[in-house]
């Protein structure tokens, strides 16, 4: 079967599966639109003929109250003792990557999407056009809205799926430039993947459909298309590709293969060719060239030479060949799901909007009712028959009466509706919603009459935070998986040493490189393998470390309590300011330098006094010897 025919059949296959998957997912997609509308303050009242005229958006308020602008930093632990230095270097690399890719912005968007929709996804890719000047390619992370990720019907866990779809709205010109083809379509197949309630399409924007699928004992493949045109088809998505001879399968090293064939094809390869000698962390050197297998000596007539005594074929050393090492491949789909509240029977987690939707609807009704009552209330004026009042905005109005009796008949009746019960029900629903999500006034920074002291208020806030611990654990779990996937991509594709920087325990800036060859090891059987045996999680204390002002205040209290040593001692001050320097305290390096100078001068003075004492003792001993 020709490649074009196979791609056509694959295209029809995946188009059909996408249609079925999206149909099964349509109910969830409809809910997503309603959730976003409520988050942005929808005026719709379910079951009512008219919309709300006054909306107190508690959904927006309660979700924004939970936003955590910090993201957890990686923590890498070595499983083997000899890998401790590699673990520290890997941890520094992942921290560098998080800063380079501006995880703060990524996290900020995720903090809204996850509680509203129940989940979102990190999409990990390798961009060969990215990287520093001395590197080729780099890891890229994109945040995918749950409406862009279409799951396999009937399967709720991403790792258990046979396939999963990703729909991305992209510029037509950008896709044409990237893949070098002319796209036939000029409109979006799925405008809902881009977002927006109107569902309108835009000229020059198309929908790229991507499917990641598993086959052949877990091998991950990728198929991508726009309209009816195939963009990418990789049965082994993570495998490296190389040009090989169509006849003998050897790697291409020139225009003509050693077998004489001139035709080559691109195909996945499971090994990498060394271009230079490399040294493993064990000290073993892998040469770029190795001796080939012994070959028989051929006589001029084409026969092989035999040993006259034994009759065995005489062999000579083979030609030098390029050395090959195994290629590393990441595991699983390149998608990481971050869940709000885990549920066993749902692909996405539980949405906060769904939980408090009834309370929001009730508040919409009561808010509208209160406003209508107040607006319809007012004052009624009683006038005698025939008396006319001036109806204008003048401050002084004239009312003409014929006699005093008409004046006595003039009166005003104030009609003020009672909205107390409506206000009470509105507040009840607001408090019910807060209680359901585990949010208290202290957690929001509001006045809390139940907390009579600062410690009590902090305790109340901590209790509320404890109820939200599950969400934080889901966030930490997602970031830990993301850091693991980033490490796998760098281990697979970062061919050049990757520059990185970090601050050591003394607060000094250190510079170095991440070289993936350091993770290449040889096992007991003599086989080479890539060492990815590290526990990658997140550091719970990293959020505190990012809040430097609080950290400095805590250290100052410890210093005053003598935790760094006796107060007034220069060595204690040096320890304290060394710690401050490591956390980026302003001008800590200048203070530390001055303390070191004082210690050095103090030490020199002490040495001088000791030298004088020693000289005096020697003179005294000499005098005693002479007298004796």
Which sequence ranges carry the predicted segments?
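Acidic/polar, low-complexity linker and loop regions
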Residues: 69, 73-97, 160-192
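Mature extracytoplasmic enzyme cores
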Residues: 209, 243, 354-357
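Non-catalytic, regulatory and substrate/membrane-recognition segments associated with hydrolase enzymes
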Residues: 210-211, 221
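Hydrophobic/aromatic interaction determinants used to assemble and anchor large protein complexes
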Residues: 257-259, 326-333
């Amino acid at each position: 079967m020709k490649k074009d025919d196979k791609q056509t059949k694959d295209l029809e296959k995946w188009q059909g599966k996408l249609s079925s998957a999206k149909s099964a997912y349509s109910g969830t997609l409809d809910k997503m639109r309603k959730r976003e509308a409520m988050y942005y303050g929808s005026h719709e009242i379910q079951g009512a003929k008219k919309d709300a005229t006054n909306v107190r958006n508690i959904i927006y308020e309660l979700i924004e109250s939970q936003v955590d602008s910090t993201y957890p930093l990686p923590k890498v632990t070595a499983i083997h003792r000899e890998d401790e230095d590699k673990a520290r270097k890997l941890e520094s690399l992942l921290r560098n990557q998080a800063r380079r890719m501006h995880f703060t912005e990524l996290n900020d968007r995720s903090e809204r999407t996850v509680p509203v929709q129940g989940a979102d996804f990190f999409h990990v890719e390798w961009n060969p056009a990215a990287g520093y000047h001395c590197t080729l390619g780099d890891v890229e992370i994109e945040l995918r809205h749950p409406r862009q990720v279409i799951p396999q019907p009937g399967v709720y866990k991403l790792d258990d799926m046979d396939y999963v779809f990703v729909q991305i709205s992209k510029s037509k010109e950008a896709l044409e430039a990237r893949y070098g083809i002319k796209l036939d379509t000029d409109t979006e197949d799925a405008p809902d993947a881009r977002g927006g309630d109107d569902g309108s399409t835009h000229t020059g924007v198309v929908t790229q459909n991507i499917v990641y699928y598993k086959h052949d004992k877990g091998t991950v493949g990728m198929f991508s298309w726009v309209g009816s045109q195939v963009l990418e088809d990789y049965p082994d998505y993570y495998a490296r590709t190389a040009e090989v001879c169509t006849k003998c399968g050897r790697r291409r090293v020139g225009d003509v293969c050693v077998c004489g064939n001139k035709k080559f094809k691109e195909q996945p390869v499971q090994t990498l060719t060394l271009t230079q000698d490399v040294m493993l962390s064990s000290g073993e050197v892998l040469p770029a060239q190795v001796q080939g297998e012994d070959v028989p000596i051929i006589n001029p007539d084409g026969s092989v030479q035999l040993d006259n005594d034994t009759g065995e074929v005489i062999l000579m050393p083979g030609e030098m060949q390029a050395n090959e090492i195994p290629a590393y491949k990441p595991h699983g789909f390149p998608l990481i799901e971050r869940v709000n509240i885990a549920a066993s029977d749902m692909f996405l987690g539980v949405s906060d909007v769904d939980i408090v939707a009834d309370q929001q609807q009730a508040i919409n009704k009561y808010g509208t009712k209160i406003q209508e009552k107040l607006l319809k209330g007012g004052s009624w004026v009683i006038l005698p028959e025939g008396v006319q009042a001036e109806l204008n905005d003048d401050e002084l109005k004239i009312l003409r009466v014929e006699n005093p009796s008409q004046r006595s008949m003039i009166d005003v009746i104030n009609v003020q509706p009672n909205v107390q019960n409506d206000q009470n029900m509105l507040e009840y629903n607001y408090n019910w919603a807060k209680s359901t999500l585990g949010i208290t006034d202290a957690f929001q920074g509001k006045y809390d009459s139940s907390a009579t002291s600062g410690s009590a208020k902090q305790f109340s806030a901590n209790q509320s935070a404890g109820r939200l611990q599950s969400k934080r654990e889901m966030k930490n779990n997602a970031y830990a998986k993301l850091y693991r996937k980033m490490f796998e991509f760098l281990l697979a594709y970062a061919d050049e040493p990757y520059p990185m920087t970090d601050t050591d325990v003394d607060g000094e800036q250190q510079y170095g490189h991440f070289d993936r060859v350091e993770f290449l090891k040889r096992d007991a059987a003599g086989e080479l393998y890539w060492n990815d045996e590290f526990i990658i999680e997140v550091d719970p204390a990293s959020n505190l470390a990012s809040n430097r002002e609080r950290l400095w205040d805590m250290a100052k209290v410890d210093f005053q309590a003598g935790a760094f040593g006796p107060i007034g001692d220069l060595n204690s001050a040096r320890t304290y300011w060394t710690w401050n320097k490591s956390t980026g305290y302003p001008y800590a390096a200048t203070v530390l330098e001055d303390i070191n100078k004082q210690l050095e001068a103090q030490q020199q003075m002490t040495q001088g006094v000791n030298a004088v004492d020693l000289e005096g003792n020697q003179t005294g001993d000499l005098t005693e010897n002479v007298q004796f």
